[in-house]
């Protein structure tokens, strides 16, 4: 079957068509992404109203382009999947209403997809990874370790108690005067810097809880930058390198605990005669090469296979939404046209909050 996917949760407008036969033989027929970076760069961050208006202006064109590249007519589509949360509500409304309109016009089912579930299942699309696996989701709005037991079955182990990792990258880059988007700019600057020059904290390192924290690290960077201002290019590079080293050390420590938790919960998954368990990284920050290298080394130390989707599927895209929607549709799951988009929508929505586990993230 063929699914049309629509993604409008933040500052990328995207449409895609996939062909789904089963989990191990699905193909991306088209995957169109239009970035709004130029719209938001003058403001140093995403402006929600500008983002929503940009989605309105371009989405219809992208849907047509996705269908054309997939050599597929709308009447041949078996279902229409759209990101329905979490995210910026204005953008979500654009995508959801467009998907509902197409569903009404064609009589094809509408499938509301959790944006986080799209990221969580991308590795199944790209690498045919087997359930269960451990997911590290790192983006501008989320930093979570999640046990993926199966489609629709997720167990959050840890989350950020303050800022998401992508947000920390962007705000640190802005503090250093680096261009928007800040994450890639900071990573590039760090290549030229001395990571040992600026002593920075590793928040929560050594603690048994599985949560993350990055606000204190941001504050330490601000204090260091203020102490040596005005900043030279070398200063900026050294601070960027020191920040990135602190981040990778912190993430390594947190994921180390999550891998131990996984091994305790699934001891038989280490039976090498079957297959190695997998550590999957997803989300926009997963494009950071220093983070990838650190996680790959850590995974191998624990006997895990390390899986990172292609860079084009780490950032927001509609192929992952179409694939998640296809898996739901294959299980007979569709959504009512009365469903409303949600700015907050945790993957483990039915889980009982645990004391000391922190809040559920800025968008979850």
UniProtKB/Swiss-Prot annotation:
The keyword Iron applies. Its cofactor is Fe(2+). It catalyses: L-threonylcarbamoyladenylate + adenosine(37) in tRNA = N(6)-L-threonylcarbamoyladenosine(37) in tRNA + AMP + H(+). Binds 1 Fe(2+) ion per subunit. It comes from Bartonella tribocorum (strain CIP 105476 / IBS 506). Fe cation binds at residues 115, 119, 316. Its EC number is 2.3.1.234. Disulfide bonds: none annotated. The keyword Protease does not apply. Required for the formation of a threonylcarbamoyl group on adenosine at position 37 (t(6)A37) in tRNAs that read codons beginning with adenine. Is involved in the transfer of the threonylcarbamoyl moiety of threonylcarbamoyl-AMP (TC-AMP) to the N6 group of A37, together with TsaE and TsaB. TsaD likely plays a direct catalytic role in this reaction. GO terms for cellular component: cytoplasm. One of its GO terms (molecular function) is iron ion binding. Belongs to the KAE1 / TsaD family. InterPro entries: ATPase_NBD, Gcp-like_dom, KAE1/TsaD, TsaD. It is found in: Cytoplasm. This is tRNA N6-adenosine threonylcarbamoyltransferase. Keywords: Acyltransferase, Cytoplasm, Iron, Metal-binding, Transferase, tRNA processing.
